[in-house]
From Swiss-Prot:
Keyword RNA-binding on entry: no
Keywords: Allergen, Pyrrolidone carboxylic acid, Secreted, Signal
One GO cellular component term noted in the UniProt record for this chain: extracellular region
Main location: secreted
Protein name: Allergen Tab y 5.0101
Length: 256
């Protein structure tokens, strides 16, 4: 019976996520002059989107590539690659449909500037990464995803131990924001959206990924240790330096 139960449990989780997305009044979440929530109001493309705007749907393969690439980087960092300290309790991240739905809504504005208010009832301070693309001809969805991942991966040359211990979005060698968010041990989930359009004779795209948490200035990106995953309850079978996806990490707690 076990092979049947597991998919059913996953289906229940997905249904609950979709129910939250469809029923939650995001307009009531923003207070204190933080502006309009990205999920507030009717969905649709803004006037900045030019012509032929459309939101691209991510297939299971697209989602798998995003998760595998991010988890592979987390796995490398957790074991102390690139001269960085070992991570004691960094988990495998999973796809979250609510974060993805809000990322999709953000891309429909066709501008990279992040909404100040994008939190949810489950994720109080989500991180966000935006990737802009300009080309004569629009590449495939998979190509856009790969390009974004490569951009973030190049920041391994910029990130340092000092940044891991006390986060800053940039160091002496350059920007580290994208990579630092992807390897935060407070991040438990990610969801992305993609919109493409034409403007000024050029093909344009905006890929946005929302993460369950964002890094706090001057606080650790992740907690270090003597050996990879030494504080995990159970390690992942594929990414052996990471905790399993079931590791009970609270994305709303701060690192100290």
């Amino acid at each position: 019976m076990a092979p049947i139960i597991v998919p059913c449990l996953l289906l229940v989780v997905l249904v609950l996520q979709c129910s939250v997305i469809n029923s939650l009044d995001y307009c009531s979440l923003c207070r204190g002059g933080r502006g309009e929530h990205v999920g507030c109001g009717s969905p649709g493309f803004s006037s900045d989107c030019g012509q032929k705007a459309r939101t691209r749907k991510f297939t299971k393969e697209h989602k798998k590539v995003i998760l595998d690439k991010i988890n592979d980087v987390r796995d490398h960092v957790a074991k102390g690659s690139w001269g960085l300290p070992v991570a004691s309790r960094m988990k495998v991240i999973v796809w979250d449909e609510e974060l993805a739905a809000l990322a999709k809504r953000h891309t429909q504005g066709c501008v990279p500037e992040a909404y100040k208010c994008r939190h949810t009832l489950r994720f109080w301070s989500p991180g966000q990464l935006n990737f802009e693309f300009y080309a004569d001809k629009m590449p495939s969805t998979m190509s856009l995803i790969s390009t974004a991942i490569k951009r973030g991966h190049t920041q391994k040359h910029n990130i340092t131990r000092d940044i891991i211990e006390k986060y800053q979005p940039a160091g002496p060698k350059g920007n580290v924001k994208e990579l630092a968010l992807a390897i935060s041990d407070r991040v438990t989930a990610v969801g992305c959206g993609l919109t493409t359009w034409k403007l000024g004779g050029k093909a344009r795209a905006l890929l946005t990924c929302n993460f369950s948490s964002e890094n706090d200035y001057n606080r650790p990106v992740y907690k270090t240790g003597n050996s990879p995953g030494e504080k995990c309850i159970k390690k992942d079978e594929t990414f052996k330096n990471l905790c399993s996806a079931q590791e009970p990490i609270n994305p709303n707690e701060h690192n100290f």
